[in-house]
Amino acid sequence: MSATAVEPAAAIETVTARRIIDSRGNPTVEVDVVLEDGSLGRAAVPSGASTGAREAVELRDEDPTRWHGKGVDRAVAHVNGEIAASVRGRDAADQAGLDAALIALDGTAAKSRLGANALLGVSLAAAKAAAAARRQPLYRYLGGADAHLLPLPMMNIVNGGAHADNPLDFQEFMIVPVGADTFAEAVRMGSEVFHTLRRDLLAAGHSTGVGDEGGFAPALRTAEEALDFVVAAIERTGYRAGPDIGLVMDPASSEFFRDGGYDYAGEGVRRSPAEHADHLAGLIDAYPVVSIEDPMAEDDLDGWRELTDRVGDRCQLTGDDVFCTDEALVREGIRTGVGNSVLVKVNQIGTLTEALATVATAHEAGWTVVMSHRSGETEDTTIADLAVATGCGQIKTGSLSRSDRTAKYNRLIRIEEELGASARFAGRSALRRV
């Protein structure tokens, strides 16, 4: 990354945090960093619903009389007070130094004193201010001259689990337009399937209300039902399930792992880890599933290793809760054979430098990386730039509805246009194993 080599130095003049509203109507932190030359960087911090136990701490006020306990006034105050005083005058171009100072200032392993939501807002806003000072888009500033790869999008079109009020145990069913030639074409293909699926669900008597991430949330009970609807929509749109558009699932298995087993409440069955793995392997065999996120629970490491041995050569197995964007946890996963891919959510770890280190470690091991949103999002499009900057080749940023999701797609469409002839679309090659 080239972010530490910016000249001339651009000193931070002011740091200002405020409370804004996320896509679920909950408060979140937004930070402005202004440099001495007037350059502005602004970043809004996302929030998750299904969170890993090892995530950095999102500081909430926990005052039940305001915002139902979800206020962020303490985090905002930390930014406007202690953090601003600490970073004022620092060189915004020294991202690693700035983030190290933020981590030291907090002084806790999980960033629980000041809050990861406070630290991340400053970290990202400083990077964007430094990019503005250099008159570069963020992807170019962070990624250098070689940043030209547009990511394969994982498009969430059916929601379940913690993201929807329906019986589906699995949290997300996604499509990936592996046969597209450009990012813009991938968006078109995804949008067409999304609207076909809407018509199909209506015709079958299902609701077409959407979940937190913009996918439909019909009252389906099994993964097979959801996958059948998605495959039919792909084919009715005129595409081939598999060669043109692959399938991705996120069971979010930690959410229904209880006392050593997997409780499928929607189906009304309980599966042992071995039975759960058998079920997933059966779905891979029966449908063109190219990737599964969190197939096993974060505390079921034996299950993770066994599933990786069993299907890891033909399916991307992406760790979210099990790694929480933590480089040390990813290194351990690489060493012990837990998965073959990592989901990167910058707010899980709390600084840009740490997130980029996780990406680098995964790439060095030959693992794939998926840049990801959270279920509670804003109009902030930073992750779109990060996907291009890192060349990770995959992005997960929700459905083809809700402007908090489509903002990221639109940003990537603009980046592809800006890159012109140098733009490359990752396509199927991003998955490597499929």
From Swiss-Prot:
Give the positions the UniProt entry annotates as the active site: E213 (proton donor), K345 (proton acceptor)
Q: Does the keyword Metal-binding apply?
A: yes
Keyword set for this entry? Answer: Cytoplasm, Glycolysis, Lyase, Magnesium, Metal-binding, Secreted
The EC designation for this entry is 4.2.1.11
Principal EC category: lyase
The processes (GO biological process) annotated in the record are:
glycolytic process
Q: Name one GO molecular function term.
A: phosphopyruvate hydratase activity
Pathway assigned to this chain's UniProt record: Carbohydrate degradation; glycolysis; pyruvate from D-glyceraldehyde 3-phosphate: step 4/5
Q: Does the keyword Cytoplasm apply?
A: yes
Please share the entry's free-text remark on the cofactor: Binds a second Mg(2+) ion via substrate during catalysis.
Residues the entry annotates as binding Mg(2+): D250, E293, D320
**Pfam families from the xrefs?**
Enolase_C, Enolase_N
Provide GO CC annotations from the record: cell surface; extracellular region; phosphopyruvate hydratase complex
Q: Where in the cell is it found?
A: Cytoplasm; Secreted; Cell surface
Q: Which reaction does it catalyse?
A: (2R)-2-phosphoglycerate = phosphoenolpyruvate + H2O
- Give the protein's cofactors: Mg(2+)
Q: Which residues bind (2R)-2-phosphoglycerate?
A: Q171, K345, R374, S375, K396
Family (UniProt):
Belongs to the enolase family.
UniProt function note: Catalyzes the reversible conversion of 2-phosphoglycerate (2-PG) into phosphoenolpyruvate (PEP). It is essential for the degradation of carbohydrates via glycolysis.
Q: What is this protein called?
A: Enolase 2
What would be the name of the gene that encodes this protein? eno2
